[in-house]
A protein has these predicted regions:
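Active-site neighborhoods and metal-handling regions in enzymes and metal-associated proteins
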Residues: 1-489
Length: 489
């Protein structure tokens, strides 16, 4: 790493987990942070210094990072309320040179480092990969939105939403990998970087961009950039009646796939995490899935304490009395991502398993039936129910996230951040997923994808909860009544 820094004439190098489109789940071949550290989680960046490599991860990934990160990597475990970039800045001398890959950082994030001596790199020195593009060039489409002023859009979810186009050729996504120029009824969809770069370099007028989603390389090509926060995210967040109907149909099939895997677990012995994961994908495809919306999490016992357990093992076998957590979802023809988490038990559960499961179920029922205005309020309420509820078990992530073309969309967001201050409106779709985790025992997370209708929360997911894991003595009368609205298997 010292040799690399010297060759680049740097003192520090920031390595992102994203790609040039700034997506959350790039292919691992595009994820320089993975190449550098061995960590496969969806978020968390790395900083190379003269004497260390630092990996920054939030509470979802504390255990996973310890298990996956290379021995030469120092894992910085962010606590609730800590900001990754604030912790990165603490390690940097502002008078020394910090390298940042221009194609893999948003303009807005780059500007938060403006008091530092930045060297913007055109090529990722960790992953100098060849880019691939959609084969066919789409010449015409009818957008759902006409920008009255010249606007350049690079966020893949926004481009897919505006064009109504979907691409299922890549794993875990339905987005089209293109950039979009709109000026009134004029529109140009770019699938080729050379064409796009030439257009931007030669465009003489003002061009509206969102610094939060355009990469620094593209921004530098524009002669007269005008920053304006995108209105499209808010448009996308409120789903139309047609989108809600498409989602209902998608979740009907997701429920069937998960129900099938429940029966598979009940009726077969000696299954590994890997066996269950393969069978789950088969079931999704059987019910019409075009792709998984993310790599399914199938985690037995202690592995289920990792909120985003990365790789289902052939060596971890589900035995009598074991818990298995399954977090999964899929894309169907509408190109909307489904997301659900359930916990099953093989055989007879013990009292601790029942207590933890029931405590998480109580939190779900109370959150689902509450009437708060913002995601922050929901998240605060959930933590008041689960923090310190059971000794040794922690709820170390936000309550939920928006869903749509991407499995993680915002707004809405049910967590402790600025976006979560957005009002949750009718038509917004989101998850409610409380959990409790103990790395020495197991974890339980129960996740339903929901939407708001007429001021009330409605669940897309209809698959029920595990009767043998519920301790009814821990439920009050109101919670028992609420539970009757869901299937108990």
């Amino acid at each position: 790493m010292n040799k690399l820094l010297n060759e680049l004439e740097l003192n520090y190098l920031l390595i992102n987990s994203t790609n040039k489109f700034l997506v959350e789940y790039p292919e691992l071949s595009e994820n320089a942070r993975y190449t550098l550290t061995g960590f496969t989680g969806s978020t968390g960046d790395a900083l190379i210094t003269n004497d260390n490599i630092y990996l920054f991860v939030d509470g979802r990934y504390h255990i996973q990072a310890d298990l996956e990160a290379n021995n030469n990597v120092t894992v910085v475990k962010l606590q609730i309320g800590q900001n990754q970039d604030d912790e990165i800045r603490k390690l940097i001398d502002p008078d020394k040179v910090l390298g940042i890959v221009g194609t893999k950082v948003s303009q807005a994030r780059l500007e938060t480092f403006k008091r530092y001596n930045i060297k913007l790199l055109e090529v990722d020195p960790i992953n100098n990969y060849s880019e691939t593009h959609t084969k066919e060039y789409i010449k015409s489409f009818e957008p759902v939105y006409y920008a009255p002023e010249a606007t350049f859009i690079t966020n893949l979810e926004e481009v897919s939403y505006l064009t109504g186009l979907r691409d299922f050729s890549k794993d875990n996504t339905a987005k089209i990998w293109s950039k979009l120029f709109i000026n009134g009824k004029e529109r140009i969809l770019f699938n080729n970087d050379d064409d796009c770069n030439e257009f931007l370099s030669n465009y003489d007028g003002e061009l509206i961009v969102d610094k939060n989603t355009i990469n620094a390389h593209d921004y530098a090509l524009i002669k007269k950039p005008v920053h304006r926060s995108s209105e499209i995210k808010m448009m996308m967040s409120v789903k139309s009646d047609e989108e809600l109907e498409a989602y209902k149909k998608a979740f009907e099939r997701t429920d069937m796939a998960v129900n099938s895997i429940r029966d598979y677990i009940e009726n077969n012995n000696g299954l590994s995490e890997y066996d269950i994961s393969l069978k789950l994908k088969e079931e999704f495809i059987k019910y019409g899935a075009k792709s998984l919306s993310f790599n399914s999490i199938v985690a037995v016992n202690q592995n289920s304490a990792q909120a985003h357990y990365a790789k289902s093992s052939k060596d971890v076998i589900l035995r009598d009395g074991d818990l298995v957590l399954i977090d999964c979802g899929a894309y169907y023809e509408s190109g909307l991502a489904t997301d659900i988490t359930r916990v099953f038990v093989k055989g007879t559960p013990n009292e601790l398993q029942k207590r933890v499961y029931t405590t998480v179920l109580k939190a779900f029922l109370n959150c689902f039936n509450s009437d708060f205005k913002t995601g922050i309020e929901y998240d605060t309420f959930a933590h008041s129910l689960l923090d310190n509820a059971i000794e040794g078990f922690k709820f170390n992530h936000g309550l939920g996230h928006g869903i749509g073309i991407n499995v993680h969309e915002a707004p809405p967001n049910l967590s402790q951040n600025e976006i979560a201050e957005t009002e949750i409106k009718n038509g917004m779709c989101f998850t409610i997923e409380p959990g409790l985790y103990n790395p020495n025992c197991f974890g339980v997370r129960l996740e339903n994808s929901c939407y708001k209708k007429d001021g009330k929360i409605v669940s897309f997911a209809k698959i029920g909860y595990e009767k043998k894991l519920i301790n009814y003595n821990l439920l009050n009368e109101q919670e028992k009544k609420w539970l009757t609205n869901f299937n108990v298997l």
